[in-house]
Amino acid sequence: MLSSKLSRRSFVQLAGAATLVAASGAAIPSNAFGKDAADWDAIVEAARGSKVAWYGWGGSAPRNELITKTLAPRLKEKYDIELELVGMDINNILTQLSGEFQAGLTEDGGSIDFIWINGENFASAKANGYLWGPFAQDLPNVQDYVDTEAADIAYDFGTPVEGYEAPYGKAQMVFWVDGAQIPQNETPIDPETFLQFCQDHPGMVTYPEPGDFTGTAIISCLIAGVEGKEEFEKLATMTEPSEDEVRAIVAPGMEYLRSLNPYLWKQGKTFPADSTTVHQMYADGELIMDAGYGEPQTDVDNGLLPATTRSFVLDTGTVGNTNYMAIAANAPHKEAAMVAINEVLSPDYQLTRYKTLGSITVLDLDRLSEEDRAAFDAVELGCAQLPLDVKLEHAIAEACGPVIPVLEKIWHDEVPGK
């Protein structure tokens, strides 16, 4: 899943950059580097012998290992491209881009080729002209396997993608319990049974205080269950929301959240500060349910959670989002970046990510060959993992970036201690 270090919480205001970039004309069309974007063979040939730098949050050792041991050798063998993986906080990446543009290092004079990015970071970088494109529509694997019109691909937390980034992976909220304590028929499936579960286990359920991105996602799942997917997803494209508009949509959901309070930890008068605290409370047995972006299979494998851990999503759905890859406007190796991104989107590498990391693929499963689809279906899952199609069928688009702080304010005004 996409780390919180690369989430909407990492948004950076790059003061003065918009004027600078607009003046320099940094938003370059995808065929402006002298290659016909329709001639993929020419792009591949131009990329040969390049060293391409992929920047992004580097805190996931399993992801880093997969890239260096699987993707990098593949790029070298197939295309003679050397992949350099650079771990860096997204704030520092955008600051580095800003500094390069202010120093006049535009077009192909930068140090960053492509970036792992999403949310407000993408919105900021795109608005300031730090991203090159549109390019995604020219990638063969996008053309063949990605539904670019799907809302969770075409919009990145409400910002139109418009070909300035290509999808990398998806993250979706999942709940889990210890199956040795909670029978299958007692697992919540919707807001009504979630309330009953809290009543049956008073004081042993809670969620992080919204403001923590997991806490906001949990209340979003429950609000969406109350409101219905269609009504909740209005928040996914509301790019200039007023508080009154958001309140009108989420009012029944907030009423429901208040109804949970008497049965929550501390009677809902206070909430844990963050998801790390909640995870520890669950591991210590203080709570009977936990949740997060993606299943806790790694914790089960490492002995931190029991092998009886069982994950689930609500029948009414759980929220999720997509993370992406974008090319810097001043990338020195744009062709190599395109080839590398295209390889990441190959069915084979997406399958490898699913097998190794449990990452939800961004490929449209219905567009895969029978052989590739069967390979995804045949992946052996751990005890705490859910089948890919179960998650995809229950996915709900998250509220867009500008809505999030409004939603959190409404929760703070209307729910704790009420």
Regions found by a protein language model. Name each.
Residues 39-48, 55, 60-82, 175:
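Short, polar/charged alpha-helical segment
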Residues 1-10, 14-25, 31-32:
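N-terminal secretory signal peptides
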Residues 36, 280, 384-418:
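Conserved C-terminal helix/tail region of periplasmic/extracytoplasmic solute-binding proteins
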Residues 318-319, 323-391:
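Mature extracytoplasmic/periplasmic domains
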Residues 257-260, 305-326:
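Periplasmic-binding protein-like
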Residues 122-124, 289-307:
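A ligand-binding cleft/hinge motif common to bilobed small-molecule-binding domains
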